Amino acid sequence: MNEYFPHLFEPIKIGKTTVKNRIFMPPISTNMADKGYVTDALVEHYSARAKGGVGLIVTEVTTVEPVYTYLPGDMSIYDDSYIPGWKKLVDAVHQYDTKILAQLFHPAYMAFPIPGTPQLIAPSNVGPYYAKSAPRAVTVEELHVLVQQFGE
């Protein structure tokens, strides 16, 4: 294996962060969150990957605002009530010297159609061919709010 991938198990520096190897786990939806909160099942899932030697884990979809949800089992991080679960998850992964980062996400027109959800938003009022109804074009003001939500 080293003949073809001589640097795979070597550390790599990304900005100011050093990752122990070049084995990265991409975001893969598990739908194991409970109303956006990290569950014990999620902690076990990600810590098992860290224990197996992954250098960097990118979590699954993590919503940054409360109105639109991609799938009901997705994780969230739009207010401080989510911090204890995230801390438990991060601590579990860090015990194996694995780095972890959240895939911050807003579903826009792909949001799950939960009753009471307002009309879906998108960059324009043209949605995908499979959508039951067209989204509403996001306003400049809403875009500023979304940018702030990603930053918080």
Positions of predicted regions on the chain:
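Flavin-dependent oxidoreductase catalytic cores
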Residues: 1-152
